[in-house]
């Protein structure tokens, strides 16, 4: 090791933790490096950007089927489908199509929500899956 290297090393041994932190910060700024990334011999350092919260996309696993609109001439067929999809009795099913929008199915799988949407749209209902 050269005399200059030994001199720098001895000075580094004597500095405080706060001074060492400031030194690392200045080295990162001056040389454009990231001291937190481990150095691997023979490989160039790879700069990695931190993952931002908005970059993380969570895929939904449960869905709600919401009945938004019922044409007056399609009420009976829609009632039949609602009763087939749910455990609602006739009175509850009628109430579900008068006070819209109304959640028909809640917390169901994607496949189940899509099947319900297709059935209800086939008889004239306007459906939203969320």
UniProtKB/Swiss-Prot annotation:
Q: Among the entry's GO cellular component annotations, what is one?
A: ribonucleoprotein complex
Similarity comment text for this entry: Belongs to the bacterial ribosomal protein bL12 family.
Q: Which organism is it from?
A: Prototheca wickerhamii
The reply on keyword Plastid is yes
One BP term from GO? translation
**General function of this protein:** Forms part of the ribosomal stalk which helps the ribosome interact with GTP-bound translation factors. Is thus essential for accurate translation.
Record flagged with keyword NADP: no
- What Pfam families does the record tag this protein with? Ribosomal_L12, Ribosomal_L12_N
Keywords in alphabetical order: Plastid, Ribonucleoprotein, Ribosomal protein
Which Gene3D superfamilies does UniProt cross-reference here? 3.30.1390.10, Single helix bin
Q: Where in the cell is it found?
A: Plastid
Q: Name one GO molecular function term.
A: structural constituent of ribosome
Q: Under what name is this protein listed?
A: Large ribosomal subunit protein bL12c
SUPFAM superfamilies tied to this protein: ClpS-like, Ribosomal protein L7/12, oligomerisation (N-terminal) domain
Q: How does it assemble?
A: Homodimer. Part of the ribosomal stalk of the 50S ribosomal subunit. Forms a multimeric L10(L12)X complex, where L10 forms an elongated spine to which 2 to 4 L12 dimers bind in a sequential fashion. Binds GTP-bound translation factors.
């Amino acid at each position: 090791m050269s005399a200059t290297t030994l001199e720098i090393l001895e000075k580094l041994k004597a500095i405080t933790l706060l001074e060492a932190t400031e030194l690392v910060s200045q080295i990162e700024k001056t040389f454009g490096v990231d001291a937190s990334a481990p150095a691997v011999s023979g490989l160039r350092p790879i700069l990695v950007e931190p993952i931002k919260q908005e970059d993380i996309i969570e895929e939904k696993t449960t869905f709600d089927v919401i009945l938004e609109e019922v044409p007056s001439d399609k009420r009976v067929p829609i009632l039949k489908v609602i009763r087939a999809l749910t455990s609602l009795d006739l009175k509850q099913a009628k109430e579900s199509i008068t006070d819209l929008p109304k959640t028909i199915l809640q917390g169901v799988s994607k496949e189940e929500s899509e099947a319900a949407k297709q059935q209800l749209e086939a008889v004239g209902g306007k459906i939203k899956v969320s």
